[in-house]
Amino acid sequence: MAAQPTIREVLFNPVFQNNPIGLQILGICSALAVTSNLKTATVMAIALTLVTGFSNLFISMIRRQIPSSIRMIVQMVIIASLVIVVDQVLKAYAYSLSKQLSVFVGLIITNCIVMGRAEAFAMANPPLVSFFDGIGNGLGYSAMLLVLGFIRELFGAGKLYGISVLPTVNDGGWYQPNGLLLLPPSAFFLIGLIIWALRTWKKDQVEAPAYRMAPQVSSKEAY
């Protein structure tokens, strides 16, 4: 029987060792859509981290009572309930941010990270370690979102959290904002660069090639 992972492992490994976006390539859609500024990136990061942590906790608590044939439905109901709570809290206390995030808070319900941890980890492990696994994967997702939001808002608008950092030419400053960074496709390139940097730093994350080219032989050797 495999040893149960420790809380420390499940909390910190997803940040660098097994990042949901950087290594598993999950949660890409929301990473493209909500990282044009740090405010929306931060709120989305907190929302997904809380939903992942508590959905793991509740699913793990009842994992032995869930029939295998309907386990996915039960997981979806729990996740959807938590997302509705988060969405209502945002609408009550941060309505403008809720409007900026649009449908992406609701789409946490179908986020691969949340569903994946519920199925792969919470269904097979005790509640406490499952909770921290959800928090850890949320932190890994959050780290990537905050890096993207920082780069895109700083160099795309000259601001951080809406506060001017680089004086732009429109305000009599020296910095010409790069508007391309505020467009969703720019996040694709930034994610690619971050993945390249992570795999350059951690060689064990580099995937083996799917196939190898056959060695070239001369016509004389062929006959």
UniProtKB/Swiss-Prot annotation:
Superkingdom field: Bacteria
GO cellular component: plasma membrane
Entry-linked Pfam families: Rnf-Nqr
NAD recorded as keyword: yes
EC number: 7.2.1.1
Bilayer-crossing regions: 42-62, 66-86, 103-123, 131-151, 178-198
GO BP term (any one): sodium ion transport
Gene Ontology molecular-function annotations: oxidoreductase activity, acting on NAD(P)H, quinone or similar compound as acceptor
Keywords from the UniProt entry: Cell inner membrane, Cell membrane, Ion transport, Membrane, NAD, Sodium, Sodium transport, Translocase, Transmembrane, Transmembrane helix, Transport, Ubiquinone
Location in or out of the cell: Cell inner membrane
Function in brief: NQR complex catalyzes the reduction of ubiquinone-1 to ubiquinol by two successive reactions, coupled with the transport of Na(+) ions from the cytoplasm to the periplasm. NqrA to NqrE are probably involved in the second step, the conversion of ubisemiquinone to ubiquinol.
Assembly notes: Composed of six subunits; NqrA, NqrB, NqrC, NqrD, NqrE and NqrF.
Name the UniProt record assigns to this protein: Na(+)-translocating NADH-quinone reductase subunit D
Lineage of source species: Bacteria, Pseudomonadati, Pseudomonadota, Gammaproteobacteria, Pseudomonadales
